[in-house]
A protein has these predicted regions:
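Alpha-helical transmembrane bundle of multi-pass membrane proteins
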Residues: 1-227
Length: 227
C-alpha cells in the first residue's frame, strides 16, 4: 500500500530513489538536450545546418553509443562506480563549458559564418563528454538502482514516486534554464550545474550502496528489514 512505502523501515531506500531521480535531472541533461540549438548558436555555430549537424552527432549519436558502455559494464564494475565516474565527467565538462562561455563573452564581434571559433569547438567537445558521461551513468544506472532497492511488494509504487519526482525536476529545469541564463549568464549557469554534479557525487558516495550481485534478501538486510 501507499502507507507502507512511507513507513520508517523503507525510508532509506525511498530517499535514495528520490535523490537519484532528482540528481539525474538537476545536473542538466534535459536542459542541454532541449536547448542544444540555442547553446551551439551562442557558442558560435552561426548556421542552422551546422547547429543541426553538431546536435545530431554530439547529442544523439554519442548518447546512443555511450549507453552501450553502461550495458557492458554495469554488472562488471558495479552501479556506484559508474555513477561516480560519470558525475566526475559531467561536472568537469560543464565547468569547461562555463569557461568557454566566459571566453566567448569576452570576444568582440558576432560569430562568423566561416566556421566555429576555438571556444565553440571546446564547447562541443565538452558537451560530448557531458552527454557520454551521463549516458553510461546517471542515464540508465539510476533506474537500475531504483528498481533494485525496493522489495516486490512496494516496488511499483516506489518507482512511480521516483518517476513523478524525476519528471517534476525535469520540468523545472527545462522551464527555468533559459531564464537562469538571462539572469546570471551562460557561464554561471553551467558552473551551477557543475556544482550540482559535485553535490550529487558526494551524496552518492555517502548514501548509495552497491547493489551489484546482491539478492533481494541481502538488499533488504542493508535497510535492516527481514524479508
Amino acid at each position: 500500500s501507499w502507507v507502507e512505502i512511507f513507513s520508517p523501515k523503507w525510508r532509506r531506500p525511498l530517499l535514495i530513489a528520490l535523490g537519484l531521480a532528482i540528481f539525474q535531472q538537476i545536473t542538466g541533461i534535459n536542459a542541454v538536450i532541449y536547448y542544444a540549438n540555442q547553446i551551439f548558436a551562442a557558442a558560435g555555430f552561426s548556421t542552422e545546418v551546422s547547429r543541426a549537424t553538431v546536435t545530431l552527432w554530439a547529442i544523439g549519436g554519442v548518447n546512443v553509443l555511450s549507453t552501450f558502455i553502461a550495458i557492458a559494464f554495469i554488472d562488471k564494475i558495479g552501479r556506484r562506480l559508474l555513477l561516480l565516474v560519470g558525475l566526475i565527467g559531467m561536472g568537469v565538462s560543464l565547468a569547461v563549458v562555463g569557461a568557454a562561455f566566459v571566453f566567448i563573452a569576452q570576444t568582440p564581434g558576432a560569430p562568423q559564418a566561416s566556421g566555429p571559433t576555438p571556444a565553440a569547438i571546446v564547447t562541443v567537445v565538452a558537451l560530448i563528454v557531458f552527454i557520454a558521461s551521463f549516458a553510461f551513468s546517471l542515464g540508465p544506472v539510476v533506474w537500475t538502482v531504483i528498481n533494485e532497492i525496493f522489495p516486490a511488494q512496494i516496488r511499483a509504487r516506489g518507482v512511480a514516486l521516483a518517476t513523478a519526482v524525476n519528471w517534476g525536476a525535469a520540468f523545472l529545469v527545462s522551464q527555468f534554464f533559459l531564464s537562469l541564463v538571462d539572469l546570471i549568464g551562460s557561464a554561471w549557469t553551467f558552473w551551477l550545474l557543475a556544482v550540482f554534479c559535485a553535490v550529487g557525487w558526494i551524496w552518492i558516495f555517502l548514501r548509495v550502496p552497491e547493489t551489484r550481485g546482491l539478492s533481494l534478501e541481502k538488499i533488504q538486510d542493508m535497510w535492516g528489514v527481514k524479508p
